[in-house]
Design a protein with these regions (language model features):
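A short, well-structured edge-of-sheet supersecondary motif
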Residues: 3-34, 183, 283-284, 290-294
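Alpha-helical scaffold elements that line and support the substrate/ligand-binding pocket
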Residues: 23, 43-62, 94, 135-166, ...
């Protein structure tokens, strides 16, 4: 069965696939009336872009190290009475999903109706949970990282990304995207062609979701990491950060999943890692075989595993070419 037929028969929500081998495009195809120039909301792939921005912020001296306490970046934040945990949570805890939160189930309605998603996240950080235990925070909590970037660089997250990551890679992310109600938010989830990055009412860009990229944009970001942070004759992210952020830093033991700094570690033997988002969005890098696979997808609630698709159906075609 051809790759195109496989997509149409089993992975019907895929918008585009780009495969790079040895820095060259060896496959590029689009589906569902999508085109190469249409950005797609990539959901949690956004997290790995935030990881890149933290590497750049550290390289430029805005942030000293990952052991700095989160609360130190928010001097005006008033810690709740009897709170004894938030004071000890570090940037590294946020990047490795080893920070505790006070909620059991995500309080999305209350969170998204607030004007300041960073403060709302701080209000939910800490509590009685144990620092160091893996707890994946898909949306609520991760925006604290955006607040840290803003408070250290003096720029919005989008501005900092445009200057230091997107522009050097010739990636266009035009504007902040705002929602007036939940209907607009759900419409955005299913949309294609909106060029921007979701922001809260204060203008703070989301850290865990909300970025729109074309499939080729995603491939470029993967290629940047395949090449150890160097692309277009420029060291955009330090080699040290690329290596550190794509090594195992924490483990989601109940699911046997390994995590770096906002990157999923797929296979340590072939040095493969991935940025993964809802709906089946993926940036996959196999450093050993010099392969990058980018898959953009239109949102549906449940999809077949993209890593399995890449490893079983895409990699074997191009591995030895």
């Amino acid at each position: 069965m051809s790759l195109e037929n496989k997509v149409k028969n089993e992975y019907g929500n895929i918008a585009g696939i780009v495969v790079l081998k040895n820095d060259s495009v060896v496959y590029e195809s689009y589906f569902n009336q999508c085109s190469e120039n249409e950005p797609i909301h990539v959901f949690s792939v956004t997290k790995s872009i935030i990881s890149m921005l933290f590497g750049i912020a550290i390289d430029k001296g805005y942030i000293k190290n990952l052991d700095e306490k989160v609360i130190d970046f928010f001097p005006n934040y008033k810690i709740k009475k009897r709170e004894k945990t938030i004071q000890h949570i570090t940037i590294k805890n946020l990047l490795t999903m080893t920070a505790p939160y006070k909620y059991k189930s995500n309080p999305y309605t209350k969170f998204f109706s607030s004007a300041d998603w960073v403060t709302s996240s701080l209000d939910l950080l800490g509590g009685s949970g144990k620092i160091g235990d893996f707890r994946y925070a898909p949306v609520i909590g991760i925006d604290i990282l955006s607040g840290i970037l803003i408070n250290t660089t003096g720029q919005s997250v989008l501005e900092f990304a445009q200057d230091n990551l997107f522009s050097p890679l010739k990636i266009s992310v035009e504007k902040n995207v705002y929602f007036r109600n939940k209907e607009e938010q759900f419409d955005f989830y299913k949309s294609k062609g909106i060029n921007g990055w979701v922001a809260d009412p204060n203008g703070t860009n989301t850290a865990g979701w909300g970025l729109s990229l074309t499939t080729m944009d995603m491939a470029k970001l993967g290629l940047l990491y395949l090449n150890k942070g160097f692309l277009y004759n420029r060291q955009i992210v330090s080699e040290k950060w690329v290596s550190e952020s794509t090594q195992v830093q924490s483990v989601w033991e109940t699911r046997n999943l390994k995590y770096g700094y906002l990157w999923w570690i797929i296979d340590e033997k072939d040095c493969s890692f991935a940025a993964l988002g809802d709906g089946g969005n993926a940036i996959y890098v196999n450093a050993k075989d010099k392969i990058v696979v980018a898959i953009s997808s239109l949102f549906v609630p449940r999809v077949k595993d993209r890593v399995d698709f890449i490893k079983n159906d895409i990699e074997p075609i191009f591995k030895f070419n």
